[in-house]
Amino acid sequence: MKALRIYAGPAARKHIERHGLRPQDVRTIPGAAGGPKGLILGPLDRFIFGRWLTQSSQQVHLVGASIGAWRLSTACLADPDAAFERFEHDYVHQQFEVPPGQKRLSPSQLSDKFAQSLEDFYGGRIGEVLNHPRYRLHVVTSRGRHILGREGRARTPVGYLGAFATNSLHRKSLGAWLERCVFSTPGAALPFGTRDFRTRQHALSEANFNRVLQASCSIPFLLAAVHDIPGAPRGAYWDGGITDYHLHLDYQPTDDGIVLYPHFQQAVVPGWLDKGLRWRHKALSLIHI
């Protein structure tokens, strides 16, 4: 199958050579940011969550940013096959009418419509996501610090200019402007190390789920930031892909398991601001993937 390529780190390759690629060995599944590129994985998502993983019973951590968080939240619904079909249909067919006298929708208008889309999709079903018997969901957002702590017409572009400049020198310096803020299924430990970047973890709940998912998908300047999420520190929360575009994380699977990473391209880019920094497009800690 020319459309599908499999890459494996040293430990994962040794494991697969010995046991084959088995659903019971999967411990973590990441879902990258990338907008509509994530839809490429639709048929694979339906196979993995609708047919393949159902042959096993172990706990699996799902780590997603932006559209990856949306995909993996959908995987936690009771009928993932049907849920993914609806997710793809709704994403492709969404239309936003521009009011008379406007050339385009403002970020706040787009955010309001997106919030309603999430409510229409997950309304009455958040409990299915949070109480899934096997899947532990981790939604990555980017929380602004200092000048980016609140959104503003002047402070946001100035803040992101500073973030871009310092990130180009050293990725860890981005933590002066933004921090990784992960919202997880209550009681679930993070399945990756956090020494690489400033990180917080908070619990997902019925009260904050939609706002967290909206924040994880809120691309700066296109959508408005989500402010003051319940159960987390005050501040502006943006797209999780800013800090973790392709979830280039220090995964730490347990029990000799592996990380299965369905991805839409060969390159793994650490952060959104690293897209133009090609020397960072490489695998640093992918031993278990």
Predicted regions: what they are:
Residues 1-61, 74-288:
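Patatin-like phospholipase
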Residues 64, 68:
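Gly/Ala-rich beta-loop-alpha elbow adjacent to hydrolase catalytic centers
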